[in-house]
């Protein structure tokens, strides 16, 4: 493993000031309109292929400055006006086909009062309670009775998505998330105790890991999450794009994972959950997948295979050996 070849302290913990100083500018946004929304198919916990409406809500920037995060580019510097979040939900629902589930992703923490005003919870609930599942994202340290109160009012299945990223303790500390693996575990126990489903985000090859170690720790991390009762695991190939990641790339501390690693981790993960946690779903994120191609001839076929595995939750036939040498 890359870190084992160096002084443990050589991988620096990022601090807010360094991360902020490296940033490019933000995008200009309207607080009354979500900055993006889409409907896509996802394998449900029942095993059906369902349509899911995902809203990327415009709101105040998250107070956590995670090293790898670029979601702040589509956030505001101030709290949204009361009524803005319900209006954003209306805007998206009116412009999309029907869906069974809804994700309210806000580039931060749903239960942060400065991001999503609690005064709007009632109006939000009125708009989403007809969905079978309502999925929000939240930091472990903000996961408490607020989520239970929201669930009680909601009257449908609530699911909270938490970014674990990795169980590697030094790498997690270097991501500036201000959390530990135990913080994550406690949050999962709390949510499951209150009949709130949990999904988690994991990074494939965060800064500080080489290709082999990136694969290994992604697999270890997904096993850890599944063993804690997480019902849905989303693997995110780590990307540049926020300033500090480019600096780490220049310093040799970070490089994108390969699409072959994306395939391998998804394969190994699906095999593990099939044997040990058959109700756990596992997805590999394919946003900007073209940037992970190292061969334009077999890259698209590998992306298509990953998408098929995302939808089927089964290991699909391998891509034939390519002229590039990868099989």
Where are the predicted features?
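Auxiliary Fe-S-binding modules of radical SAM enzymes
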Residues: 1-34, 38-40, 44-45, 226, ...
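N-terminal pre-triad scaffold of radical SAM enzymes
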Residues: 26-76, 93-105
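Core AdoMet radical
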Residues: 70-88, 96-116, 127-143, 157-184, ...
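Acidic (Asp/Glu)-rich catalytic clusters
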Residues: 92-97, 124-129, 147-157, 188-195, ...
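Active-site-proximal loop/turn and secondary-structure-junction residues that shape catalytic pockets
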Residues: 108-110, 140-142, 166-168, 204-208, ...
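Distinct, well-ordered alpha-helical segments
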Residues: 114-122, 144-153, 212
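Surface-exposed cleft-lining segments at the edges of enzyme active sites
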Residues: 135, 169-177, 204-212, 252-253
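Conserved C-terminal portion of the radical SAM core fold
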Residues: 182-244, 263-286
């Amino acid at each position: 493993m890359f870190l084992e070849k160096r002084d443990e302290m050589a991988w620096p913990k990022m601090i807010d000031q360094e991360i902020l100083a490296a940033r490019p500018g933000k995008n200009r946004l309207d607080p009354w309109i979500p900055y993006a929304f889409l409907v896509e198919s996802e394998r449900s916990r029942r095993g059906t292929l369902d349509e899911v409406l995902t809203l990327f809500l415009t709101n105040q920037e998250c107070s956590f400055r995670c090293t790898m995060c670029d979601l702040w580019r589509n956030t505001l510097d101030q709290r949204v006006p009361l009524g803005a979040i319900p209006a954003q939900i209306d805007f998206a629902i009116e412009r999309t086909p029907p869906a069974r589930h809804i994700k309210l992703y806000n580039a931060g923490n749903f239960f942060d009062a400065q991001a999503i005003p609690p005064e709007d919870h009632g109006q939000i609930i009125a708009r989403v309670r007809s969905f079978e599942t309502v999925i929000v994202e939240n930091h472990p340290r903000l996961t408490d009775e607020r989520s239970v109160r929201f669930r009680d009012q909601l009257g449908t299945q609530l699911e909270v998505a938490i970014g674990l990223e990795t169980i590697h303790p030094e790498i997690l500390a270097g991501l500036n998330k201000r959390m530990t693996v135990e913080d994550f575990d406690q949050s999962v126990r709390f949510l499951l105790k209150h009949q709130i489903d949990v999904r988690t985000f994991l990074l494939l090859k965060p800064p500080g890991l080489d290709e082999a170690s990136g694969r290994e720790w992604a697999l270890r991390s997904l096993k850890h999450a599944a063993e804690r009762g997480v019902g849905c695991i989303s693997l995110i190939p780590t990307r540049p794009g926020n300033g500090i990641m480019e600096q780490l790339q220049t310093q040799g501390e970070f490089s994108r994972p390969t699409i072959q690693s994306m395939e391998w981790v998804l394969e190994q993960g699906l095999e593990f959950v099939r044997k040990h946690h058959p109700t756990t779903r596992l997805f590999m994120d394919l946003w900007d997948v073209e940037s992970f191609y190292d061969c334009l001839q077999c890259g698209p076929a590998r992306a298509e295979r990953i998408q098929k595995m995302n939808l089927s939750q089964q290991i699909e036939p391998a891509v034939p050996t390519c002229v590039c040498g990868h099989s």
